[in-house]
Amino acid sequence: MPSKIALLGAMIGLTACWTTAATAQASEKDWTLVWADEFDGSKLDRKKWKPEKSCWGGGNQERQCYTDRSKNIKVADGNLHLIAHKETFTGPDLPPEFSNKPYPQKTQEYTSGKIRTLGISSWKYGKVEFRAKPPKGQGTWPAVWMMPANSVYGGWPLSGEIDILEGVNLGATCETCTGDVGENRMISAIHFGDYAPKNKLHDTRVALPSNALPSDEFHIWTLEWGEGMMRFYLDGRKYWERTSADWETASPLAKSNPVAPFDQPFYIMANLAIGGGLSEKNNDKGVASDVTPAAFLIDWIRIYQCSSDKEKGLACMQGDKESK
């Protein structure tokens, strides 16, 4: 079987088919792969990732402890597996960057996995792309998202947050969804503005053209990010765009910078949360008793930067016309 890397060129061409030929050629030529994890080995690459160990609930009243156990994080069959289980577990209340030793302890009723490139790798502008299969069930909340490496403009959300994929309660009852499979929409969002409760966000929900469940098979998510511009794609189709006219930061450190806070290096992370406000307050409410074990599978994650426009990253981005 060909390796994922060997198939990369063909896959780029397939994705580009949704755009005009001229744009596809420029995009394929100028995007340079700068970082990737194909998850082809038998264990997590610790030179690329740090598992988070915390039980704080992510600030969203989530119900899991994130652990560094193979029960919750494993690499097998060419995929990263982030696996949630129902089990009582006690661990550090907060991630190490939020708390001094000795870390306070907290007990939760679920365990799961979360990995980050924090302190290892971060990027300013580029294309972030991954192939993933989210789990379904009331109470599941898988995500691939980005946070500022250094919080130059201040604490959350003054320095921004980029949520590329959030899959909340997939398959649960949904009266406003199209189709007959229940909740089939995935969320993308950006967070910015001032400290809570004055924080702001823009978000969108997107379903597959077939209205099928995203949890039924793997799909490819793409973020193209340049100075003052973000474009989001699912399986090559653009579904959302934000520009610097849509965001701001209340930080005095921005000094009237019109593209702040999304003009700094961000790191990437992936996790599978259980419960939390966004999940438990919607669809069938709460956490289903049979939702675990649940697994969030990621086939690969690849990050590119624009070789023809290293400063702003805009020249490689696809055109304004929405893909058909």
Question: PLM ranges: what are they?
Answer:
Residues 6-17:
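Bacterial N-terminal signal peptides
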Residues 1-5:
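Positively charged n-region of N-terminal signal peptides that target proteins for export
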Residues 25-324:
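GH16 jelly-roll
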Residues 19-21:
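N-terminal signal peptide c-region/cleavage motif recognized by signal peptidases
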